[in-house]
């Protein structure tokens, strides 16, 4: 027994168009076969969701369903009502709800023209490239307008003809009793025209697939996850329709030395125990390639931060520049020689509370705490 369409979508019987669309969108994204490859249960659920939405979004079909239930669409009822998802099924639903990849509707015109699909290209760049910016050359396989037929899909010297089934409307109406249902024309798939003599090069599609070389400008300061849109560089439209867009999704590779937080950079630099105690300096190479000296005052503690103003990342399309923060990591000596050990032991004997105020004060406070706790 078929499940109730309202229960399938998880909505109340009085749900409005907005609630239906929201419920369908959520469930369709969850159970779409592309997200669940090989899962036949999800594929079956996906078909149920589509059937339910296809019925309830149409006022006439919904009225019939509310009155007669599933019987309205069985043989002898409303012939062909909500059954199947060929013409006017999956494609029409997802064109209505989701549009193409980036949300632009793939629209048909009365002349059979369709907007081309948007394309996605993933690009990985280094932090240095994100810092300086670059112009990248990419090769993208995509459909382009057929030069043989100029995108019409018809054999040169011929023209598309008006569809004999829908007479150019792209829709056909089926009447059963007092019910009337309008569906996408199965002969022209809603285009209103058919091609009697298709172009031999593109097989009537009006476009062919080729690999194109494109130049992509990546501005300085670009961040990980940024999307760049190249208008009209996506798939060519069908039969002379407008092209889709190309979206470049950028990923900035992790750096060996620098971590990024917005426009600021962070770097951890190891220094020796003697440099931390006696003071000194070290040099760091910043992303612009320059050497910058960092002075270490005597008595520098582990984790101390030094700020190099204006040595971070440029802010995208602004004159501002972030800062570079250097954090010291005091390295404890290992594999000591006998003489080194003797010197450190001698240093320990000569040390006072003034040399290590934090550790000395900490242990003194800890001792006092437990002594006072024991007296209670």
UniProtKB/Swiss-Prot annotation:
Against Pfam families, the record matches this protein to: DnaJ, DnaJ_C, DnaJ_CXXCXGXG
Q: How is the cofactor bound?
A: Binds 2 Zn(2+) ions per monomer.
Places the protein is found: Cytoplasm
**Record-annotated residues binding Zn(2+) 1?**
146, 149, 199, 202
Q: Name one GO biological process term.
A: response to heat
Q: Where is the signal peptide?
A: none
Entry keyword annotation includes Cell division: no
Q: Which cofactor does it need?
A: Zn(2+)
- Claim: Ribonucleoprotein is one of the keywords in the record: no
**Subunit-structure text:** Homodimer.
NCBIfam families registered for this protein in UniProt: DnaJ_bact, PRK10767.1
Family label: Belongs to the DnaJ family.
| Physiological role | Participates actively in the response to hyperosmotic and heat shock by preventing the aggregation of stress-denatured proteins and by disaggregating proteins, also in an autonomous, DnaK-independent fashion. Unfolded proteins bind initially to DnaJ; upon interaction with the DnaJ-bound protein, DnaK hydrolyzes its bound ATP, resulting in the formation of a stable complex. GrpE releases ADP from DnaK; ATP binding to DnaK triggers the release of the substrate protein, thus completing the reaction cycle.
The molecule here is called Chaperone protein DnaJ
Task: Tell me which species this is from.
Answer: Mesorhizobium japonicum (strain LMG 29417 / CECT 9101 / MAFF 303099)
The opening ranks of the lineage are: Bacteria, Pseudomonadati, Pseudomonadota, Alphaproteobacteria, Hyphomicrobiales
